[in-house]
Structure formats: C-alpha cells, structure tokens
C-alpha cells in the first residue's frame, strides 16, 4: 500500500470514529456571533491551526476548501459567504464526505442563518481538483499538504494556483520541522498520514509556494506542535515540530523576487520627521512600519544608526509594504 492509500485508510477510520487527538491543535477555535459548532464537528477538527481569517473574507468570496474533515472550517467560511455553493469542499474519502454532510445537517439545526446549500461537497483529488480555472477567491487546506511527498506537493500547489482568481488567496496551515528526519520516519506511511513525518523546513515550504508563482507570502502564525522522541518513535534524537499558518497571494511575481512577510518591522528614530528610502517606503518618526524580508535586507544594507529592523515574529497581521 502506498502512502496515499494509507492516508485514505487513516481518514476513513477517522470519519467513522472521530479521533480527537488526530492532527489536532490547541489553538482556540474562532468564535463568531451567532455561530454554533456541533460537538461532533469540533471533535473532527483534524487541523493544526486555522485557515479562517476574516480580513480575507470580504465581498461574499467564492471559497474552496480541500480536505473537509468534519466540516468545521467549511461552516466558518460559509459564515462569511452566505450564498448557494459559496463554499466548495473537496475530499477523496467517501466516508469523510458523508460524515461532513451529516454534521452540516446538525449545524443547520443549531444555526438559523446556515443552510446546507451554502456548501457544495464534491469527491475529488487535491492533485486534480474538480474546479474551473480562475474561479476561486480564497482556497484553503489545513494539515493536508504536509502529507504529500515533494512531487505531489508541487502538483497540489499548482492546482490551487490554477483555480484561484488573480489576486486570490491560498491560506494554509501545516506542520514544519527544521531538523532532518531519518529514513525510518520519512518512510513510515502512517506517521506521514498522521501529519508528523512529512514536515519540511519553513524556507523549503515557502519556496514551494513561490516556485509555482505566488508573488506575495504572509507568515501569519508559527506555534509549537509536536515532539518526536526515541521512546515513542524510531529516532535517536528529539525532534521538534511546529505548525505554521501561511497566506499565499496570486499576484504578479516582482522582478526582484517574491515579497515574503515574516513579521519584520522598520522603525526610524532620527532627527527628521520621516525617512524616505526613495524606493516607495516612507517611515514616520518612531512609528513601526511592517516590511517584507526583502525590504528589511535592503534597509539593513544602508547601515543607518537611526534605523531599527526588528527580527521576524512569524505573526504578520497585514499592512505595511514591500
């Protein structure tokens, strides 16, 4: 059995019998006025972060969600897109689609604003999405793409890029790991399906996104996720895994390379009211300005004693410039 078939088997079982500990996160779940999440739906939250960010979800967007789980984030997305088939959920596991549909029936009873027709569930493969080109405003996946090996990951990202409209957004949450993993971990199909041994370094993850054409990336969160230790896993060293939330924007690739926002800021504290680098960045006196890493590097090369560049927080929340 290949790793993709093992993954289907793991999530078939998780659909039939909810596994609260599977790929879960301790991140608080978004609470919105008038939104009630059914208990079973919450138990089937097989993610490692959140892909639901209100600032992405304006003007009744068309939303695609790949890997439906229990439907919790689909329900949250539909809160912002209250239209027939405003949200499309795609999954390759029949049992997960059936469980998700049952959860929506319960959600309809608990939420007066929600109608099942707001969400269209489709059987489909992340590697060949049943979605038209340039038809989606916001695409999302939560703790799925880390399972893919490199060739499949590249194909899945290409598919997301294909279906997004110009300036559309791909919002993702996945485990990452800066330490190398041995072959016993990498080749363990079940550990990969459980979102543990497929984790790659953050910079590699970001490069996969820019290689398929995304011109702007935002690192919105980075948190502790899991430990792989020698008592429980086939490893001689303790391996630390984090989860990351990233938004990739389908805008044109700048001539000087992608704009990647990791939470850096510049602060000018000189004698003048402002500092202008004559490249589109004006820093007011003692006011932080969010900047991309490319701009941070360029400003640092000026070697000014009245200019401070903060380290990456990996919690970028919008604004600023590149």
What annotation goes with each model-predicted range?
Residues 24-62, 76-80:
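Conserved alpha-helix/loop element of class I SAM-dependent methyltransferases that forms part
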Residues 59-128:
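Class I SAM-dependent methyltransferase SAM/SAH-binding core
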Residues 127-139:
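A short acidic, Gly/Pro-enriched loop at the edge of an enzyme's catalytic core
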Residues 137-152:
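A short SAM/SAH-binding and catalytic strip from SAM-dependent methyltransferases
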Residues 154-169:
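A short glycine-rich, Lys/Arg-flanked "PGG" loop and its adjoining helix->strand segment in the class I
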Residues 176-196:
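Short, glycine-/aromatic-enriched active-site segment of Class I SAM-dependent methyltransferases
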Residues 197-213, 219:
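Short alpha-helix
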Residues 212, 218-224, 229-322:
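C-terminal lobe and adjacent flexible extensions of AdoMet/dcAdoMet transferase-like proteins
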